[in-house]
Swiss-Prot record:
Main location: host cell
Membrane topology qualifier: Single-pass membrane protein; Single-pass type I membrane protein
GO cellular component: a single term: host cell endoplasmic reticulum-Golgi intermediate compartment membrane
Renumbered ranges of motif ER-retrieval motif: 117-119
The record's account of how the chain is modified after translation: Poly-ubiquitinated by host with K63-linked polyubiquitin chains.
Organism: Severe acute respiratory syndrome coronavirus 2
Subcellular location: Host cytoplasm, Host perinuclear region; Virion; Host endoplasmic reticulum membrane; Host endoplasmic reticulum-Golgi intermediate compartment membrane
Protein name (database record): ORF7a protein
Coiled-coil positions: none
Length: 121
């Protein structure tokens, strides 16, 4: 029982918390620092901002902050190459040659042909 408690204590002491963020490739991501005096561990440059926030360019990358209390916050950014459909404005294109238009045009043409033929007779 003491061994299990000891292993649980070691596990809690070396705790890692994972944070996942999805973003559009090349945009700037605004994240909150987990602790004010943490140590940054990563190869992507980040820009510290006010209120314990930082900005990072979105690429598929992983970095971490090691807090003084021993907790390590691991961030995983997953970059998408296309923007979400929410921001894409799609306009409906009305084609001139839709089936309904062709049917109506054919009926009008046939009617005109018969009426002009009767007037000439």
């Amino acid at each position: 029982m003491k061994i299990i408690l000891f292993l649980a204590l070691i596990t809690l002491a070396t705790c890692e918390l994972y944070h996942y963020q999805e973003c559009v490739r090349g945009t700037t991501v605004l994240l909150k620092e987990p602790c004010s005096s943490g140590t940054y561990e990563g190869n992507s440059p980040f820009h510290p901002l006010a209120d314990n926030k930082f900005a990072l360019t979105c690429f598929s990358t992983q970095f971490a902050f090691a807090c003084p209390d021993g907790v390590k916050h691991v961030y995983q950014l997953r970059a998408r190459s296309v923007s979400p459909k929410l921001f894409i404005r799609q306009e409906e294109v009305q084609e001139l040659y839709s089936p309904i238009f062709l049917i109506v045009a054919a009926i009008v043409f046939i009617t005109l042909c018969f009426t002009l033929k009767r007037k000439t007779e």
